[in-house]
């Protein structure tokens, strides 16, 4: 199933509390085709201590795995009940709820049953590395995940899984899937050589394709790398394509519209179309991305996960969602484009249909540049669509040849297409 996941730090949305997620917010996400909400920063993390990074601190430095952050509640004494109410509201509105699971480390002030060493990985100085050689850690983690499932959570985005024994993760997923088969497990994986292991052996439902699709798109857009790399990536993935989750942004990566990445949201439309529409892989949308949030208030093009901040465009987006206040023209235009492309992703031909990379048969086609253009078909029994992405500063006017093998599915053998710079054209053929 092609999921559209919306990642959000609830402390930076609206009033910064669970209560900000109301019918207006859910209606808004429905217009984007979102079906899963990943709430980042729910389990209680370290805050206000000398070792903590920032104020209120990092969501990945967990001090109590069976509590939620008090600052997310209207009444801190009722914070867990307020979280359960949030989950119930999400379910009523038709959304699944994901939270973070961090198996590699805990906060320096962690109190609980997970066994850990007295050192950290790298510069994660607000954490201590977990000791998975102690069987009590596995039992404690299984209990923690069961706890969150009992609260109604539908799945987990699992942090830095390559730093944890694969056998331990396999055991956790197997045990929990036996009890709750629909539980979703998303793996943050960076080594492409490990994709098959974590998908087919360990049992994750979705894997980050950061080292494939994301890195390829970034190299194409920022470094002039050839668009042929998109073909090479799916050929390498093969049968694993549906198990990937693609993205242009998340909390670890720079905002696409930041000066450190693309410089503007419109310059990312071609990359968005390729990442979102090429195959049945799921897609992750980071809050504010859809209006061109550029993290201008933060460092290095990232919205801070350590400090209180108020990204300006996210504030305007929330005002628009809650009160109907108009967005500035530029942000409204970005949102329209995102809604357009996300709308295509909901169609059967895109969400579960067939894909045909057209680049190989268009090297000599009029106007087609295999290094700067990417063209493909999405089709099923009822419709066929041509998508052409233009990764260049110049408008592209081209004729795209349709190979004989899929002409009956498309109803044509050739199609003329015009695509603006850094944009994508989506054309219905049938």
Question: Could you say what each language-model-derived stretch is?
Answer:
Residues 143-146, 159-244, 261, 265, ...:
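Active-site-proximal helices and loops of the catalytic beta/alpha 8
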Residues 2-36, 41-151, 172-180, 194-196:
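Substrate-binding/active-site clefts of carbohydrate-active enzymes
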Residues 4-6, 37-39, 97-99, 156, ...:
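Hydrophobic faces of well-ordered beta-strands that scaffold small-molecule active sites
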Residues 415-430:
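C-terminal beta-strand-rich structural cap/linker in extracellular carbohydrate-active enzymes
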Residues 8, 29, 39, 65, ...:
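Conserved, mostly hydrophobic/aromatic
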Residues 47, 250, 255-399:
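Loop/helix patches that line or flank the sugar-binding groove of alpha-linked glycan CAZymes
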Residues 394-411:
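Beta-strand-rich binding/interaction modules
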Residues 34, 150-153, 204, 280:
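A structural motif
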């Amino acid at each position: 199933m092609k999921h559209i996941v919306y990642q959000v730090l609830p402390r930076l949305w609206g009033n910064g509390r669970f209560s900000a997620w109301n019918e207006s917010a859910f209606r808004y996400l429905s217009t984007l085709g979102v079906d899963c909400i990943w709430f980042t920063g729910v389990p209680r993390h370290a805050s206000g201590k000398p070792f903590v990074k920032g104020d209120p601190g990092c969501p990945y430095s967990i001090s109590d795995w069976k509590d939620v952050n008090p600052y997310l509640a209207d009444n801190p004494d009722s914070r867990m009940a307020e979280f359960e109410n949030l989950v119930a509201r999400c379910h009523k509105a038709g959304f699944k709820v994901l939270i973070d699971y961090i198996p590699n480390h805990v906060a320096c002030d962690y109190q609980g049953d997970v066994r850990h060493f007295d050192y950290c990985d790298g510069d994660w100085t607000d954490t201590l590395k977990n000791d998975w050689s102690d069987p009590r850690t596995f039992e404690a983690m299984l209990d923690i995940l069961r706890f969150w499932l009992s609260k109604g959570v539908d799945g987990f985005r699992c942090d830095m899984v390559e730093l944890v024994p694969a056998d331990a993760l396999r055991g956790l997923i197997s045990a929990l899937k036996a009890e709750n088969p629909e539980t979703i497990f998303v793996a943050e994986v960076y080594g492409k050589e490990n994709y098959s292991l974590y998908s087919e052996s360990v049992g994750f439902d979705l894997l980050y394709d950061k080292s494939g699709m994301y890195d390829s798109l970034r190299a194409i857009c920022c470094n002039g790398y050839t668009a042929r790399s998109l073909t090479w990536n799916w050929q390498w993935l093969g049968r694993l394509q549906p198990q990937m989750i693609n993205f242009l942004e998340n909390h670890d990566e720079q905002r696409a519209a930041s000066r450190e990445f693309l410089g503007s949201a419109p310059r990312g439309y071609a990359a968005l179309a390729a990442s979102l529409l090429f195959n049945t892989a799921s897609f992750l949308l980071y809050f504010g991305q859809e209006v061109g949030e550029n993290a201008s208030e933060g460092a290095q093009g990232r919205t801070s996960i350590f400090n209180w901040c108020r990204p300006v465009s996210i504030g305007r987006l929330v005002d628009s969602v809650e009160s109907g206040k108009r967005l500035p023209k530029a942000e409204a235009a970005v949102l329209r484009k995102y809604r357009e492309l996300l709308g295509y992703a909901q169609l059967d031909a895109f969400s579960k249909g067939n894909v045909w990379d057209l680049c190989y048969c268009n090297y000599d086609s009029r106007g087609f540049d295999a290094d700067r253009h990417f063209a493909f078909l999405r089709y099923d029994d009822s419709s066929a669509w041509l998508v052409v992405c233009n990764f260049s500063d110049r408008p592209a006017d081209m004729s795209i040849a349709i190979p004989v093998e899929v002409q009956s599915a498309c109803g044509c053998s050739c199609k003329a297409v015009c695509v603006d710079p850094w944009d994508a054209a989506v054309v219905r053929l049938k």
